[in-house]
Amino acid sequence: MQRLGRWLALAYFVGVSLLGWINWSAPTLAATASTEEELVNVVDEKLGTAYGEKIDLNNTNIAAFIQYRGLYPTLAKLIVKNAPYESVEDVLNIPGLTERQKQILRENLEHFTVTEVETALVEGGDRYNNGLYK
């Protein structure tokens, strides 16, 4: 008799738990389906533009300039410090550039682009040190 009582109690608790779970998850699923909207990350959106293919002078951090000879670290620091730019050629108007530095910049203008400043990419100190190390 005790064994039957235990089995009945176990069945009761399992049944109540299942009913509670079914009732609890149904409103959650309905709420999720009704409020579904496509969320777009502004940084991912920016990567779909020329930003993902070239160095964006207004949004890229210093580390991106490593791939081009002569730009990192001195010119990269000057470029980031004097941003934002209206056009790629504005980078040649940075005060204090030597003729050699201007020549290096001219040789690399094809690798640059300029887009609107995106706060998610430039706020804080991330343009100088994004915390990614090899």
Swiss-Prot record:
SUPFAM superfamilies on file: PsbU/PolX domain-like
This protein's UniProt keywords: Electron transport, Membrane, Photosynthesis, Photosystem II, Signal, Thylakoid, Transport
Biological process terms in GO annotation: photosynthesis; photosystem II stabilization
Membrane-spanning ranges: none
Keyword Thylakoid applies: yes
Coiled-coil regions listed: none
Membrane topology, record value: Peripheral membrane protein
GO CC terms: extrinsic component of membrane; photosystem II oxygen evolving complex; plasma membrane-derived thylakoid membrane
Domain of life: Bacteria
Co-factor note (free text): PSII binds multiple chlorophylls, carotenoids and specific lipids.
Signal peptide: 1-30
UniProt entry tagged with the keyword Transmembrane: no
Cross-referenced Pfam families: PsbU
Subunit structure, interactors included: PSII is composed of 1 copy each of membrane proteins PsbA, PsbB, PsbC, PsbD, PsbE, PsbF, PsbH, PsbI, PsbJ, PsbK, PsbL, PsbM, PsbT, PsbX, PsbY, PsbZ, Psb30/Ycf12, peripheral proteins PsbO, CyanoQ (PsbQ), PsbU, PsbV and a large number of cofactors. It forms dimeric complexes.
Family recorded in the similarity comment: Belongs to the PsbU family.
Name listed for the protein in its UniProt record: Photosystem II extrinsic protein U
The species this protein was found in: Thermosynechococcus vestitus (strain NIES-2133 / IAM M-273 / BP-1)
